[in-house]
Amino acid sequence: MNEGDVLVVGGTSDARALCRQLDAANVAYTLSVATPAGKALAGDIKGQVRCGRLEYGQMVAWLKENRTRWVIDASHPYAEMVSHNLLRACETAGVLLSRYQRPEQLSNLTHPLLYTARSIADACEIARRFGPRVLLTTGSKDLAVWRAGLAEKTLLARVLPVAEVIQRCSELGFGVGEIFALCGPFSADFNAAFYHQCRADVVITKASGAEGGYQEKVQPCLDAGIPCIVIARPTPLVTGDELLESQAAFAQRLSRWLAAAKE
């Protein structure tokens, strides 16, 4: 078995946890991450790490060149384009594709101040009902879209403490008091103090699941009487037995894959 046989895609803590299982099973693999931050998060995994974004055509070429037999999409739940390209590439190259996606916990909380949005545009429409200070805990990728959609609001961005991210915030017009560069997940107490300190009138977040500290983000917001808008996840492109929603489910799928590989 070579390192191209299995490809794990994603610079997330979920992807790293899957790699640990592959390490424990002595499976050779490659972890593909998009950014240096994702590479750093991989830590001391045993597999090969490749860094850089792959478009559809590049994915197909990589899969064929490395004779890949199994792809595990552990990319961020909201990385729709990555998942879409992976699905197409695996179909083209004839490679098995599994999707690992943590449970979202969206139904665990209900509250009059908790709103669910299906898109950024939907979230912007809801946010316009509230005060001027909008705290975004949705990552840095779509900040330009938020800026355009909520031009009349004061946007506060909680983002990763990465130089290129802070530079992007600055280029989009975020001031010194509007950029909060922090690496989560955070405790409920931390978030409660943070919301108070930044004087947020409304908080916008994503259904990040337990690993992303979803309840620790949302509950303190609601307890403080602050409206919270949660952007729901896109519908998974992979369904059935290849949609894995826990580490235990992945362990079972890995066992079946190893058994089939020996036949």
Curated annotation (Swiss-Prot):
Pathway the protein takes part in: Cofactor biosynthesis; adenosylcobalamin biosynthesis; cob(II)yrinate a,c-diamide from sirohydrochlorin (anaerobic route): step 7/10
Biological role: Catalyzes the reduction of the macrocycle of cobalt-precorrin-6A to cobalt-precorrin-6B.
Catalysis: reaction(s): Co-precorrin-6B + NAD(+) = Co-precorrin-6A + NADH + H(+)
GO MF term list: precorrin-6A reductase activity
SS bond list: none
Keywords: Cobalamin biosynthesis, NAD, Oxidoreductase
GO BP: cobalamin biosynthetic process
EC number: 1.3.1.106
Family note: Belongs to the precorrin-6x reductase family.
Protein name: Cobalt-precorrin-6A reductase
Domain of life: Bacteria
